[in-house]
Amino acid sequence: MLGVVATLRVKPGIEGQFEAVAKELVAKVNATEPGCRLYALHRAETAGTYVFMERYVDQAAVDAHRATDHFKTLGRKMGEYMDGRPDVVRLREVE
C-alpha cells in the first residue's frame, strides 16, 4: 500500500469555497476509484490549513488517480483558493 499526505493552506476568507470543491473531489474519488482505499479531507487546528489523507493499493492506482478528469479539473479549481503550493509526503507501508 502507498500513502499520500498533502497539506494545503487556503487563502483567508474563502475556506468555505475551497471546502465545497474539495468535498466534491473526495466524493468523486471515493465513488469511482477502486484502487484508492482512503481519500479524506481533514481540517487542521491551524486556521486555513487542510490535510488530504490518501491510501492506494499500488502505484498504478496513484497514477490512475492523477490521470482522472475530476482530479485535473477540481484540483486546478482548488489551486485558485490555495495560498502556495501543497506540502506532499509520499509513503510506503511497512509490511
Residues of each region from the PLM?
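Short alpha-helical
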Residues: 13, 47, 69, 73
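A short, well-structured alpha-helix characteristic of acyl/acetyltransferase catalytic modules
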Residues: 19-21
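Short, charged/polar surface micro-motifs in flexible loops or helix N-caps
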Residues: 46-49, 58-60
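Short, surface-exposed ligand-recognition loops at beta-strand->loop->(often short) alpha-helix junctions
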Residues: 10-17
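Active-site-flanking beta-strand signature of metal-NTP-handling nucleotidyl enzymes
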Residues: 3-8
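An amphipathic, aromatic/His-enriched active-site/gating alpha helix that lines ligand/cofactor pockets
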Residues: 24, 28-36, 55-89
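Glycine-rich beta-strand-turn "strand-cap" elements at beta-sheet edges
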Residues: 2, 40-48, 74-95
